[in-house]
From Swiss-Prot:
It comes from the Eukaryota. Pfam families: CASP_dom (PF04535). It is found in: Cell membrane. NCBIfam families: A_tha_TIGR01569 (TIGR01569). Residues 1-31, 101-112, 188-192 are cytoplasmic. Disulfide bonds: none annotated. GO terms for cellular component: plasma membrane. It is a multi-pass membrane protein. Homodimer and heterodimers. It comes from Panicum virgatum (Blackwell switchgrass). The lineage of its organism: Eukaryota, Viridiplantae, Streptophyta, Embryophyta, Tracheophyta. InterPro entries: CASP/CASPL, CASP_dom, CASPL. This is Casparian strip membrane protein 2. Belongs to the Casparian strip membrane proteins (CASP) family.
Length: 192
C-alpha cells in the first residue's frame, strides 16, 4: 500500500499526486458577488461621467444677444470628476475578465492581491474626483458670502440638478469599491 503525498510546485516525487480539495461554495459565491459588484460600479461610474459630461444650461439676459451659459467644462473640478469616473469605469471593465477567472479558480491568490491593490487605487481616484465636484456643487447651491461667491442654482436650476445627480452614481460606486476590497480581503484571509 502506498502513502499519498501532496507534491508542491517545484518538487518531484514518485508518489502519486493527490488533487487539491475542490473549492468551497463560499469562495465561488464571493467571486460571483465580485463580478456583480463590478458591473454595478461600472453602471454608477459611467452614468456619473455621462451625466456630468453632458451638463450645460444657457440663460438669456434681457435680450437674446446676451446670454449666460453654465457648462461642466467651465470648472476644472467637474472636468476632473468626469475624467476620474471614466478612468475608474475603464479599469472596472478591464478587471471583469480577471474577476471571472476567480469564479473558475477561487484559490488564485496573486491575481486577487492585484485586484485589491488596483481597487484601492481606483477608490482613491474616485474619492478625489467626487470630493472635488461635491465642493463645487455645494458652492453652486449655497455660495460663500465671505468670498462674494453667490449661489447660482436659483438661476441655473437644471444645471444644478444634473451636477447634483451625477454625484450619486459616483458615491455609490465608491461604496461598491469598498465592498469589493473587503470581499477580496475576506477571500484572501480565508486561505490562511
Amino acid at each position: 500500500m502506498t502513502k499519498d503525498v501532496v507534491v508542491e510546485h517545484g518538487e518531484s516525487s514518485k508518489a502519486p499526486l493527490v488533487a487539491a480539495p475542490a473549492a468551497s461554495g463560499v469562495g465561488r459565491a464571493a467571486s460571483v458577488a465580485d463580478v456583480f459588484l463590478r458591473f454595478l460600479a461600472i453602471v454608477g461610474t459611467i452614468a456619473s461621467a455621462i451625466s456630468m459630461g453632458t451638463t450645460n444650461e444657457t440663460l438669456p439676459f434681457f435680450t437674446q444677444f446676451i446670454q449666460f451659459e453654465a457648462k461642466y467644462s467651465d470648472l476644472p473640478s467637474f472636468t476632473f470628476f468626469v475624467a476620474a469616473n471614466a478612468v475608474v469605469c475603464t479599469y472596472l471593465v478591464l478587471s471583469i475578465p480577471l474577476s471571472i477567472v476567480h469564479i473558475v479558480r477561487p484559490r488564485a491568490r496573486y491575481s486577487r492581491l492585484v485586484l485589491v491593490f488596483f481597487d484601492a487605487a481606483m477608490l482613491t481616484l474616485l474619492t478625489a474626483g467626487a470630493s472635488a465636484a461635491a465642493a463645487i456643487v455645494y458652492l453652486a447651491h449655497k455660495g460663500n458670502v465671505r468670498a462674494n461667491w453667490f449661489a447660482i442654482c436659483q438661476q441655473f436650476d437644471s444645471f444644478c440638478e444634473r451636477i447634483s445627480g451625477s454625484l450619486i452614481g459616483s458615491f455609490a460606486a465608491m461604496v461598491l469599491l469598498i465592498m469589493l476590497i473587503f470581499l477580496s480581503a475576506f477571500a484572501l484571509a480565508r486561505r490562511h
